[in-house]
C-alpha cells in the first residue's frame, strides 16, 4: 500500500495526496454481493433533518460483508482485493470450496490466491478467524466480536488492530485500538492481522469538492451561529464563544460523558488515554 502526491498543476491538486491502490486487483465488484443504497440526505422518514452536514455525493452501491464468518472448517481462496466506497478498509472476495462467495474485511498482507478458513481448528494465520480462546497471546487481531455470534464490531476501519494480552477464566484481555484495555468473552471470535489500507490516515483531499464527492457538506462554525442555534453563538462582533461546548451544551474538551452506572464498566480494565 502506498500514497501518491500529485503535481501542483492546479490549486485543487497542490496539496492533494491520494491512495496508490497498489493492493487493489479489480474494479468490478461481485454482482451477487452488491445492493442499492438510498441517499437520505440526513432526513428521517418524516422528512425532518436528523443529521447535519450530510447529503449529496457520488452514487454508491453497498457491498454485503460477512462479519460473522460462520462457515467453520470450509477453506476459501481469496479471489480479489477490492475498493469499497462505503468504508475506509479494502475488502476481499472469498470463494469457498462449496461454491459460495462472500466479502470480508481484508487484512494487511492478505494476497490473491491465499487460503483462509474460520473455526476453532484454524491456524493463527493472517485472514483466519478463530475464537479468542485459540489465538496465541500477543497476536495482533481485528474484526472482533463483543458478544458470541454477534459478528465483528471492533477494529474494522482502515489500519486498525487490537492485541490479545492475556486470558483469565472465561475472559480475554484485549488492548483496544483506542488504548482501552477491556475484557471480552473467550468464545467471541476475531480475525488474525491488522486491517488493510493503513495509509488511509495520510490521505489529503486537496479541495472542498472531493469532500463533497464523499457526501459531506460544509460545516458551520458554532461561533458564527446565533444563540438560538448553539451555546457558542451570538455576541457583539467576533467573539470567542466562551467555553467550548457541543450543540447540546456538553463541554467539548476532555469532559467524560460515559455513565458511571453503565453495566459494561466492569469489563473495562483500563480506560483510554485522552
UniProtKB/Swiss-Prot annotation:
Molecular function terms, GO-annotated: rRNA binding; structural constituent of ribosome; transferase activity
GO CC annotation terms, alphabetical: large ribosomal subunit
Gene3D superfamilies, per the entry: 2.30.30.30, Nucleic acid-binding proteins, Ribosomal protein L2, domain 3
Region (Disordered): 34-53, 216-274
Assigned keywords, A-Z: Ribonucleoprotein, Ribosomal protein, RNA-binding, rRNA-binding
Keyword Secreted: no
GO annotation (BP), single: cytoplasmic translation
SUPFAM superfamilies the record matches: Nucleic acid-binding proteins, Translation proteins SH3-like domain
UniProt entry tagged with the keyword GTP-binding: no
Stored NCBIfam families: rplB_bact (TIGR01171)
Family from the record: Belongs to the universal ribosomal protein uL2 family.
Subunit record text: Part of the 50S ribosomal subunit. Forms a bridge to the 30S subunit in the 70S ribosome.
Physiological role: One of the primary rRNA binding proteins. Required for association of the 30S and 50S subunits to form the 70S ribosome, for tRNA binding and peptide bond formation. It has been suggested to have peptidyltransferase activity; this is somewhat controversial. Makes several contacts with the 16S rRNA in the 70S ribosome.
The protein's name in its UniProt record: Large ribosomal subunit protein uL2
Organism listed in the record: Flavobacterium psychrophilum (strain ATCC 49511 / DSM 21280 / CIP 103535 / JIP02/86)
Gene: rplB
